[in-house]
Amino acid sequence: MTTETRSLYSQLPAIDRLLRDSSFLSLRDTYGHTRVVELLRQMLDEAREVIRGSQTLPAWCENWAQEVDARLTKEAQSALRPVINLTGTVLHTNLGRALQAEAAVEAVAQAMRSPVTLEYDLDDAGRGHRDRALAQLLCRITGAEDACIVNNNAAAVLLMLAATASGKEVVVSRGELVEIGGAFRIPDVMRQAGCTLHEVGTTNRTHANDYRQAVNENTALLMKVHTSNYSIQGFTKAIDEAELVALGKELDVPVVTDLGSGSLVDLSQYGLPKEPMPQELIAAGVSLVSFSGDKLLGGPQAGIIVGKKEMIARLQSHPLKRALRADKMTLAALEATLRLYLHPEALSEKLPTLRLLTRSAEVIQIQAQRLQAPLVAHYGAEFAVQVMPCLSQIGSGSLPVDRLPSAALTFTPHDGRGSHLESLAARWRELPVPVIGRIYDGRLWLDLRCLEDEQRFLEMLLK
């Protein structure tokens, strides 16, 4: 060991001496004596490695307390951190999809703080059913006879098929054999549910007679799958649920539909593209309809199945139902969200998803212009900060070809180097509340459709 190396080692402090320093008192109070000591030992090992490798001390050796504080602060951050979503995708799967209404947030908090009547009947002190209250709400909204709630729509489809068609055939149009995120494919789900897929028609055209010819003594269901995350256009043909229900009645085969996103209101009244609604399919005679809780409905992640009482009963009694059931927090949030639909005149104000989707491009443009000046003052030396028109998307496989006119703040490096955009985006991701945009066409875009808290936005970007 050289004299220089020995000198560097001698500069490393003893843990006991560090802990006696007043700057470590608050750290020990906040993070605990054990964790602080554990980290100091780790840092001493790191420092010795640096000395051996480069004959120097790490820069943080000048202020051990500051480095410990920085590391423990970062360590204490939740894995699920709030972010500002300016990607232009309203229902962003990677960012948690639908924001919850205040009523849903309050309902979840209450359910977490207190015992609740999850499966308890106050009338007779007996055991109740956890889906009952929500089933009544869903029946009121959709016109269905009964309802069942599980933890997501993939689970809903799995349960629906396993409980009603295991060991039998399910007839589906080839053009509806969808794949959604995470390689969730309808054929794979059918296989897991114990069903045999009988695909009919072609990718772009399927006729009623294709279904008719496929039905045999082993057919359990005729199934429709709403292609909510892609669109086939041009020379196409598909039969709707009403026509398929009529055929099913003739052949004595029930019809079920995986609706995917599942809007409970006619979106066209808000100037948005129309999506099929569960209540329309129930009115058409579909036996079971499944859809998501956290997409266009604007609630928590959940799989909802509405339909005929006898078929829902088969789902409720299936062993998979217990494995897939929703917990009390999900049910509390979903109930509070569904109650908002009982007052449709206030829905676009109280339901965040609908509120964000219905923001006009003009309002967003004015917001962008209002925010431009302070950002130019802060970033103008390195970037051209402009207000640009853009198109938002709904996201989560909803209305894939439809875009919503919006406005964005864009950042273009004066030197034209793309690495500066990557660096800026990375800096914003490291903020206490990360700001998430997207890089496209030589610019960093911040689509403001989902920006409601301007003050927090400016506090982050002007740091």
Swiss-Prot record:
Cofactor(s) in the UniProt record: pyridoxal 5'-phosphate
Localization, UniProt: Cytoplasm
Catalytic activity: L-seryl-tRNA(Sec) + selenophosphate + H(+) = L-selenocysteinyl-tRNA(Sec) + phosphate
Listed GO biological process terms: conversion of seryl-tRNAsec to selenocys-tRNAsec; selenocysteine incorporation
Modified residues (N6-(pyridoxal phosphate)lysine): 295
Listed Gene3D superfamilies: 3.90.1150.180, Type I PLP-dependent aspartate aminotransferase-like (Major domain)
Cellular component, GO annotation: cytoplasm
Domain of life: Bacteria
Recorded metabolic or biological pathway in which this protein acts: Aminoacyl-tRNA biosynthesis; selenocysteinyl-tRNA(Sec) biosynthesis; selenocysteinyl-tRNA(Sec) from L-seryl-tRNA(Sec) (bacterial route): step 1/1
Principal location listed in the UniProt entry: cytoplasm
EC numbers: 2.9.1.1
Similarity annotation: Belongs to the SelA family.
Function: Converts seryl-tRNA(Sec) to selenocysteinyl-tRNA(Sec) required for selenoprotein biosynthesis.
Assembly and interaction partners: Homodecamer; pentamer of dimers. Binds only one seryl-tRNA(Sec) per dimer.
Protein name: L-seryl-tRNA(Sec) selenium transferase
